[in-house]
Amino acid sequence: HSDGTLTSELSRLRDRARLQRLLQGLL
């Protein structure tokens, strides 16, 4: 049952890291 929440957390962290990387590229 916790697998779904764990995968969602990982995807969220992945998206956040991607956004931070894009922001750093712009700066």
From Swiss-Prot:
Chain segments annotated as coiled-coil in the UniProt record: none
Residues modified to Leucine amide: 27
Pfam families (UniProt xref): Hormone_2
Cellular-component GO terms for this entry: extracellular space
One of the protein's GO biological processes: response to nutrient levels
Keywords: Amidation, Hormone, Secreted
GO molecular function: digestive hormone activity; hormone activity
SMART domains with a match to the protein in the record: GLUCA (SM00070)
Keyword NADP: no
Protein location: Secreted
Primary role: Hormone involved in different processes, such as regulation of the pH of the duodenal content, food intake and water homeostasis. Exerts its biological effects by binding to secretin receptor (SCTR), a G-protein coupled receptor expressed in the basolateral domain of several cells. Acts as a key gastrointestinal hormone by regulating the pH of the duodenal content.
Family note: Belongs to the glucagon family.
Protein name: Secretin
Species for this entry: Oryctolagus cuniculus
